[in-house]
Amino acid sequence: MPRVKSNVVRLKRKKQILKHAKGAFGGRSKLWKAAKETVERGWRYAYRDRKNKKRDFRRLWIVRINAAARLHDMSYNAFINGLHASGIEVDRKVLADLAVREPEAFAAIAEQAKKALDAKVAAA
């Protein structure tokens, strides 16, 4: 089997890792082993936090919707239940945005949800 020299490939890989490590403190941006560990750890955190970001934003939207719904004398749970009962299909991201940027539109949606909830309770 012929001998394989990996000089070009190895240097290219090292260059990429050191490029990603730029901005790290001290030897973490200069020394190969430390830089490699730093970059790989950073990639692990980035992968994990891309998943956590979705959870965090959903939690933020729910907090905002809850606060806005309570201004209209409804809990978050009752508000969402009323939305389903009235057939309004708006996701939490849009609802949270409406609650912050357009309170009048959110108030109209909350009123419809409240009516649908009252009708649902009266029917039961």
UniProtKB/Swiss-Prot annotation:
Q: Does the keyword Ribosomal protein apply?
A: yes
- Which species? Gemmatimonas aurantiaca (strain DSM 14586 / JCM 11422 / NBRC 100505 / T-27)
Question: In UniProt terms, what function does this protein have?
Answer: Binds directly to 23S ribosomal RNA and is necessary for the in vitro assembly process of the 50S ribosomal subunit. It is not involved in the protein synthesizing functions of that subunit.
Keyword annotations for this protein?
Answer: Ribonucleoprotein, Ribosomal protein, RNA-binding, rRNA-binding
Q: Annotated Gene Ontology MF terms?
A: rRNA binding; structural constituent of ribosome
Q: Membrane-spanning residues where?
A: none
Give the GO terms filed under biological process for this record: ribosomal large subunit assembly; translation
Official protein name in the record: Large ribosomal subunit protein bL20
UniProt xrefs under CDD domains: Ribosomal_L20
Is the keyword Cytoplasm in the record?
no
Family, according to the entry, reads as follows: Belongs to the bacterial ribosomal protein bL20 family.
Coiled coil feature spans: none
Q: Name one GO cellular component term.
A: ribosome
